[in-house]
Amino acid sequence: MEAYKKHTSIAALMNRSNVDTDQIIPTQFLKKVERTGFGIHLFHDWRFLADNVTPNPEFELNKPVFKGAKILVTGDNFGCGSSREHAPWAIADYGFNTVISTSFADIFYTNCFKNALLPIRVSKDELAALMAEISANEGVKFTVDLEAEKLTTPGGIVIHIEVDPFRKESLLGGLDDIAWTLKHEDKITAFEEKQKQTLPWLWK
């Protein structure tokens, strides 16, 4: 998993609430278990017209000014609906590494941290201020400093990022569950060797 670093990036505005996982990545694209290749299908039903090929000019993220954005600013209750890890996979594969909302579905929120994606919870007033700044200056860049737990904007907004210390360390170190386990490989091996002596029948 790629380590999360301090960055200053374009903040893309998608002012929609209750965006569920089926809207993030429709079910017809859940046909593989690799984490890559889902970005092209992100928000598919909104991004493309009925022919499934032509970009929808009315969809927010299709604006050229948001090209290359790493920060997604969106409405309340993001990531609700059925549980599917493909949702954060698609968001990360598209190029985002940060999602800002007032609230996230619990399972989606947890899955973000396992996929190098930082979900930032803000108050309704803070979200309104961020959205207003983007609307007034589309293409504006925000700075996210996870180590300092701070989000800043050119307009003077400063927001404290509330994040669990373990999850923060995982993102900064690029450590998913497997990587955390491998950090204790020596202890695991020692335990196994001891168990082979005390409970040999388990290893037959």
Swiss-Prot record:
It holds the Pfam family Aconitase_C. InterPro entries: 3-IsopropMal_deHydase_ssu, Aconitase/3IPM_dehydase_swvl, AconitaseA/IPMdHydase_ssu_swvl, IPMI_Swivel, LeuD. Gene3D superfamilies: Aconitase, domain 4. One of its GO terms (biological process) is L-leucine biosynthetic process. Pathway: Amino-acid biosynthesis; L-leucine biosynthesis; L-leucine from 3-methyl-2-oxobutanoate: step 2/4. Belongs to the LeuD family. LeuD type 1 subfamily. Heterodimer of LeuC and LeuD. This is 3-isopropylmalate dehydratase small subunit. It comes from Psychromonas ingrahamii (strain DSM 17664 / CCUG 51855 / 37). The lineage of its organism: Bacteria, Pseudomonadati, Pseudomonadota, Gammaproteobacteria, Alteromonadales. The gene is leuD.
